[in-house]
């Protein structure tokens, strides 16, 4: 009877240790993500290219690393932005900037009482697209505001690494298969 209680207590401890290890892995991943977000000043410091609109620069499935600490976006820079009201990151190149001229700064000072310059305004386009992105922007929006709409500027990439996330979102049954394989591995590992 005592050996039964001892083995039962031991298996409970092992189960609890596995749960705590899993929680540790999840919390570590979350903290790394948040730390990277703070370091890059981007809400999403890593994104996956979802379409072929930026070919040949980036292919579908490429993993992009973003940086959002620059106060202005330059002509030709590749940026990631979210359309207002939608949470789909779009990766396109800045094809036109609307720099604030001195007259605008004076007008802003007259209206607001401060001489702060309005945000950098941008027009973007995919390298593989015929037209600019004005049709993709929110209703009544003709350009992007650097501070409001831009998630970050592309600073690096890893080819095809993000294709796994595309496959998992396009084929939901793959998630089930993957979870089943991981569960089977946990069960088999426990028996040893």
Curated annotation (Swiss-Prot):
Molecular function per GO: serine-type endopeptidase activity
Entry annotation: catalytic residues: 53 (charge relay system), 92 (charge relay system), 133 (charge relay system)
Catalytic activity, EC: 3.4.21.89
GO biological process: protein targeting to ER; signal peptide processing
Domain of life assignment: Eukaryota
Chief site of localization: endoplasmic reticulum
Topology of the protein relative to the lipid bilayer: Single-pass type II membrane protein
Alphabetical UniProt keywords: Endoplasmic reticulum, Hydrolase, Membrane, Protease, Signal-anchor, Transmembrane, Transmembrane helix
Stretch forming the signal peptide: none
Entry's transmembrane regions: 19-39
Catalytic reaction list: Cleavage of hydrophobic, N-terminal signal or leader sequences from secreted and periplasmic proteins
InterPro entries from the UniProt entry: LexA/Signal_pep-like_sf, Pept_S26A_signal_pept_1_Ser-AS, Peptidase_S26, Peptidase_S26B
GO cellular component labels: signal peptidase complex
Lumenal side stretches: 40-192
Subcellular location(s) per record: Endoplasmic reticulum membrane
EC main group: hydrolase
Region (C-terminal short (CTS) helix): 177-188
Segments on the Cytoplasmic side according to the record's topology features: 1-18
Family according to the record: Belongs to the peptidase S26B family.
Self-association state and partner proteins as the record states: Component of the signal peptidase complex (SPC) composed of a catalytic subunit SEC11 and three accessory subunits SPC1, SPC2 and SPC3. The complex induces a local thinning of the ER membrane which is used to measure the length of the signal peptide (SP) h-region of protein substrates. This ensures the selectivity of the complex towards h-regions shorter than 18-20 amino acids. SPC associates with the translocon complex.
Its job: Catalytic component of the signal peptidase complex (SPC) which catalyzes the cleavage of N-terminal signal sequences from nascent proteins as they are translocated into the lumen of the endoplasmic reticulum. Specifically cleaves N-terminal signal peptides that contain a hydrophobic alpha-helix (h-region) shorter than 18-20 amino acids.
Domain remark in the UniProt entry: The C-terminal short (CTS) helix is essential for catalytic activity. It may be accommodated as a transmembrane helix in the thinned membrane environment of the complex, similarly to the signal peptide in the complex substrates.
PANTHER family: SIGNAL PEPTIDASE COMPLEX CATALYTIC SUBUNIT SEC11
Name by which UniProt lists this protein: Signal peptidase complex catalytic subunit sec11
The organism of origin for this protein: Aspergillus clavatus (strain ATCC 1007 / CBS 513.65 / DSM 816 / NCTC 3887 / NRRL 1 / QM 1276 / 107)
Lineage of the organism: Eukaryota, Fungi, Dikarya, Ascomycota, Pezizomycotina
């Amino acid at each position: 009877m005592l050996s039964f209680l001892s083995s039962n207590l031991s298996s409970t401890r092992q189960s609890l240790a596995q749960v705590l290890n899993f929680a540790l892995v999840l919390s570590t991943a979350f903290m790394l993500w948040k730390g990277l977000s703070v370091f890059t000043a981007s809400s999403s410091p890593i994104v996956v290219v979802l379409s072929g609109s930026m070919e040949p620069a980036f292919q579908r499935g490429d993993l992009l690393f973003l940086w959002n600490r620059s106060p202005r976006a330059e002509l030709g820079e590749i940026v990631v932005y979210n359309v207002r009201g939608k949470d789909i990151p779009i990766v396109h190149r800045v094809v036109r900037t609307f720099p604030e001229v001195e007259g605008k700064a004076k007008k802003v000072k007259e209206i607001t009482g401060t001489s702060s310059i309005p945000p950098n305004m941008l027009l973007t386009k995919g390298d593989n697209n015929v037209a600019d992105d004005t049709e993709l922007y929110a209703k009544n929006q003709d350009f992007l505001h650097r501070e409001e709409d831009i998630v970050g500027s592309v600073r690096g990439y890893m080819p095809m690494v993000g294709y796994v996330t595309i496959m998992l979102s396009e084929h939901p049954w793959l998630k089930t298969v993957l979870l089943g394989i991981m569960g089977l591995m946990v069960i088999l590992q426990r028996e040893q």
